[in-house]
């Protein structure tokens, strides 16, 4: 049964009266919303009149930034207002495109809740609700942290403001809330309660891309209202005029899922004395016109639609096995992704997804034959502490061809199942690792790391760790590492067979005869096993990084002691060892060069795109300058 809410008469509270210096600093800079809308030449009646909720014509996220009308005339500043640099609403969409993956945006919102653990948060809930106005789904995030006062909610909904200075907090740029909510849906509402300095407040804010697009704004306008709830009935807190507060309220009622003040205030009932609730609605659709996020496939999960799923088709048993592993499931199951999102297990904090708590999972707990290798990053200016790299075989080894490293930063998973070995290689199958790399910086979307020198050194080290671990342990599962014998005296060049190009095209061999060792030995001829073995070793100048060696120099590995006076044995032994070492080095270098080449190509494309955008902006600015000059001449 709904409560009967009564709101006291509007009271005018001067922001300077707050004891917190920061309050005046932020709230004092917020211009009058009514004057902003009037300045945009959009009728307040049109913007705030309560009517059926509107939506964007284009509901696909990747197309929602297209066909945005850029005003051709200069927007004048209202009398008495300070001229300010405008942030066009299109920036909200462009900024959110940093999240290529929708689950990455959800993880950003979870990070905000986890950062609230230091303020007493014990739970964060993620759920789906239905909007009564149009019966569409909405995504809800709710935590019981310290909440936000009027000053805090304005910082949250401002661009690029971050108050997180702790070394343990995940957020740092002050951009995550805007990019993540906009990536998931066109509109977001924030409800927050807090107690600061003995005064209890509750605040409501609306970040609506739909509102900004539909009303033709050329500046990001965020309507917000605040209440003082220290007494029995909530009292509106006014920082401008009563008319401005009413305008904010009317815009909230028109463009939000709630039609009345009672419905708005009901959203605080399950928050308690402190906490925050975020409702994201007008969720994005995919190119097929259906919601990106699926709520119907699993009642206790939120899923991304799997484009590789073959409805009605029987899949190979091995394919089903691979797709049942968490290395595949996390891409489409939010529950699977969240389960390994944080490295250390929480003691007094729960993540509840659609009514069911998420069990944390660390794949290192299931390693077979685990080892811990200490790694100390080397840098010229900073002395970093050593970090432990846990490495081992997954429990499904050797059946599943899965390998890689889960790399965390400040307890948060940044790069899951990072495969550092050459794609398509069987060397390293089943080898997994887990580490926390606080010495490298994550990218803005927290799904990768910045390509620094420390990152490249770590990548090279992880390749070596994978290779060494495989070399030392692959025999456990029946793999063989074919190596040239250490006794150099047993190596002789075949006397009656001059070096020639080997055109042999090997056919697939049974598993017990496949070499899983280093990339040197490619062919073993056992036709004359009683007296000698013939190993084909590629010459250094004929090797390539793909692992295909089409040219060989036959070398005989003679198990019998050489004849006295054979002076060529030591030379051949040294040559083979040098070839093996050189081959490994060239192999790794070529792989790195290919990656660097791809990175350079991506950088060039990005810069070309950025150049085109800058040219377009310059043209628009030129038009604005011309219009301004004409106005000045008329004056």
Curated annotation (Swiss-Prot):
Keyword check for Coiled coil: yes
SUPFAM superfamilies: ATPase domain of HSP90 chaperone/DNA topoisomerase II/histidine kinase
Gene Ontology terms: biological process: chromatin organization; defense response to virus; DNA repair; plant-type hypersensitive response; positive regulation of defense response to bacterium; positive regulation of defense response to virus by host; positive regulation of plant-type hypersensitive response; positive regulation of systemic acquired resistance
GO molecular function: ATP binding; ATP hydrolysis activity; DNA binding; endonuclease activity; RNA binding
Record localization: Nucleus; Endosome
Cofactor(s) it depends on: Mg(2+); Mn(2+)
Assembly notes: Homodimer and heterodimer with MORC6. Component of an RNA-directed DNA methylation (RdDM) complex that contains at least MORC6, MORC1/CRT1, MORC2, SWI3D and SUVH9. Binds directly to SUVH2 and SUVH9. Interacts with the resistance proteins RCY1, RPM1, SNC1, RPP8, SSI4 and RPS2. The interactions with various resistance proteins are disrupted when these resistance proteins are activated. Interacts with the PAMP recognition receptor FLS2.
Protein name, UniProt field: Protein MICRORCHIDIA 1
Gene that produces this protein: MORC1
């Amino acid at each position: 049964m709904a409560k009967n809410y009564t709101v006291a008469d509007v009271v005018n509270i001067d922001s300077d009266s707050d004891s917190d210096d920061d309050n005046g600093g932020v709230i004092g800079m917020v211009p009058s919303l009514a004057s902003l809308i009037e300045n945009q030449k959009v009728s307040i009646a049109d913007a705030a009149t309560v009517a059926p909720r509107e939506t964007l014509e284009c509901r696909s996220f990747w197309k929602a930034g297209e066909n945005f009308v850029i005003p051709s005339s200069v927007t004048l500043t209202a009398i008495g207002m300070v001229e300010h640099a405008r942030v066009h609403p299109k920036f909200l969409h462009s900024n959110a495109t940093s999240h290529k993956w929708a689950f990455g945006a959800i993880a950003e919102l979870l990070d905000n809740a986890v950062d609230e653990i230091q303020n007493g948060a014990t739970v964060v809930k993620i759920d789906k609700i239905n909007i009564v106005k149009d019966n569409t789904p909405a995504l809800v995030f709710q935590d019981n942290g310290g909440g936000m006062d009027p000053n805090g909610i304005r910082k949250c909904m401002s661009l690029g403001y971050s108050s997180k200075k702790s070394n343990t907090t995940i957020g740092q740029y002050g951009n995550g809330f805007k990019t993540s909510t906009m990536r998931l849906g066109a509109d977001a509402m924030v409800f927050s309660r807090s107690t600061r300095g003995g005064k209890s407040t509750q605040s409501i804010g609306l970040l609506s891309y739909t509102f900004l697009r539909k009303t033709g704004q050329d500046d990001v306008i965020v309507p917000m209202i605040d209440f003082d709830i220290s007494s029995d009935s909530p009292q509106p807190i006014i920082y401008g005029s009563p008319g401005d507060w009413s305008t904010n309220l009317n815009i909230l009622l028109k463009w939000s899922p709630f039609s009345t003040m009672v419905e708005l205030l009901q959203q605080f009932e399950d928050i308690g004395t402190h906490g925050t609730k975020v409702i994201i609605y007008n969720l994005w659709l995919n190119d097929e016109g259906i919601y990106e996020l699926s709520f119907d496939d699993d009642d206790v999960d939120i899923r991304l639609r799997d484009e590789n799923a073959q409805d009605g088709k029987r899949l190979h048993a091995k394919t089903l096995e691979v797709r049942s592993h968490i290395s595949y499931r996390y891409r489409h199951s939010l529950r699977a992704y969240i389960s390994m999102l944080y490295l250390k297990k929480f003691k007094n904090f729960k993540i509840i997804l659609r009514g069911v708590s998420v069990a944390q999972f660390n794949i290192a707990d299931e390693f077979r034959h685990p080892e811990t290798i200490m790694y100390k990053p080397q840098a010229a200016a900073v002395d970093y502490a050593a970090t432990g790299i846990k490495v081992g075989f997954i429990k499904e080894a050797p059946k599943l061809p899965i390998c890689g490293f889960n790399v965390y930063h400040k307890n948060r998973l940044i790069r899951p199942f990072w495969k550092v070995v050459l794609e398509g290689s069987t060397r390293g199958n089943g080898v997994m690792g887990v580490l926390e790399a606080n010495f490298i910086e994550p990218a803005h979307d927290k799904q990768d790391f910045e390509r620094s020198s420390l990152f490249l050194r770590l990548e090279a080290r992880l390749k070596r760790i994978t290779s060494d671990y495989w070399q030392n342990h692959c025999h456990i599962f029946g793999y063989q590492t074919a190596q040239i014998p250490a006794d150099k005296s047993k190596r002789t060049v075949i006397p009656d067979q001059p070096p020639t190009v080997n055109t042999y095209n090997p056919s697939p061999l049974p598993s017990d005869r496949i070499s899983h060792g280093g990339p040197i030995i490619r062919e073993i001829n056992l036709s004359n096993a009683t007296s000698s073995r013939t190993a084909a070793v590629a010459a250094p100048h004929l090797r390539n990084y793909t692992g295909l060696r089409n040219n060989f120099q036959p070398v005989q590995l003679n198990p019998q002691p050489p004849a006295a006076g054979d002076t060529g044995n030591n030379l051949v032994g040294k040559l083979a060892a040098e070839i093996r070492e050189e081959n490994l080095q060239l192999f790794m270098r070529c792989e790195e060069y290919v990656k660097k080449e791809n990175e350079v190509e991506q950088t060039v494309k990005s810069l070309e795109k950025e150049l085109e955008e800058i040219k377009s902006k310059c043209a628009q600015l030129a038009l604005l300058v011309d219009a301004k000059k004409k106005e000045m001449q008329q004056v």
